Amino acid sequence: MRGPDDTSGPVGPGPAEEPPSPPARPGITLTAAQRAVDAWISRFEEGYWPPLTNLARLVEEVGELARELNHRYGHKPKKAEEPDQDLGLELADILFVLLALANEQGIDLDARFAEVLEKYEVRDGERWTRRR
């Protein structure tokens, strides 16, 4: 699809409240994830949905995450019969739609995410107190 795979593992902060789920594919990159989404979508005649449909899907998935976070940490308790949702799966649903949207638009998220990390480092690297 877009460039060689990066074999380095994921980088980021540690778990906040719940331990991370084990990755389906250890060390998967955004490029590899985009390829996996492309392979899955390419199996179907309909192919990629239009950008505005994917935006609606993204908003729907973010709404599901917001609902769960509101139940856990906000002022809206769940109904007794309503089960807890898996936050990791809710986030992965959002990621899937983002990957599909990036693919449909021809965007290499590995490259763009590296640019965003650099942007944050330059813009915000001295904004907060560093850990010692």
Regions found by a protein language model. Give the residues of each.
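Flexible "arm" and connector segments at domain edges
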Residues: 1-91, 95-132
